[in-house]
């Protein structure tokens, strides 16, 4: 009997980016929400200043710290992805971030804020994965809460 199969998986919400340069922020919103800090992209965009060119890994680590998420950047091979604590963030295509939600010896599933959920074989993922991952875990200062900016339809009229 596999005891890990009895462990409840965290549900990771899919959050799509609305601008090309906010994939990193969208990934942080997904991971934070999976850990119980239910937030959205608009709230994080207002709370954390971002460059028009997007976020670097270092900037994502700073924001994660401010949100109460312990983080560590790792360099690893594709075959080592199943060893990561998920959900975590992967550096993708040299200029993009995705959230890894599942990995085994044959395939991975990522939430790509540009296109949605994707399941890829390791061979298919190989040209995209840069070898850098960011593991994130709640600290004692992490707050489980809902923090979403309401959208007011009156601004459209």
Task: Go through each PLM region and give its residues.
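Membrane-integrated ABC transporters
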Residues: 1-157
């Amino acid at each position: 009997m596999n005891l890990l199969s009895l462990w409840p998986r965290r549900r990771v919400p899919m959050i799509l980016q609305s601008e090309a340069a906010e994939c990193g922020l969208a990934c942080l919103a997904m991971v934070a929400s999976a850990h119980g800090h239910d937030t959205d992209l608009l709230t994080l965009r207002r709370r954390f200043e971002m460059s028009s060119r997007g976020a670097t890994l270092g900037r994502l680590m700073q924001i994660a710290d401010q949100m109460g998420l312990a983080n560590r950047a790792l360099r690893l091979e594709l075959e080592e992805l199943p060893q990561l604590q998920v959900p975590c963030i992967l550096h993708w295509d040299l200029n993009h971030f995705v959230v890894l939600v599942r990995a085994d010896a044959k395939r991975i599933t990522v939430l790509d804020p540009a296109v949605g959920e994707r399941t890829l074989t390791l061979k298919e993922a190989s040209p995209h994965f840069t070898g850098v991952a960011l593991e994130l875990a709640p600290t004692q200062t992490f707050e489980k809460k809902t923090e979403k900016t309401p959208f007011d339809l009156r601004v459209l009229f």
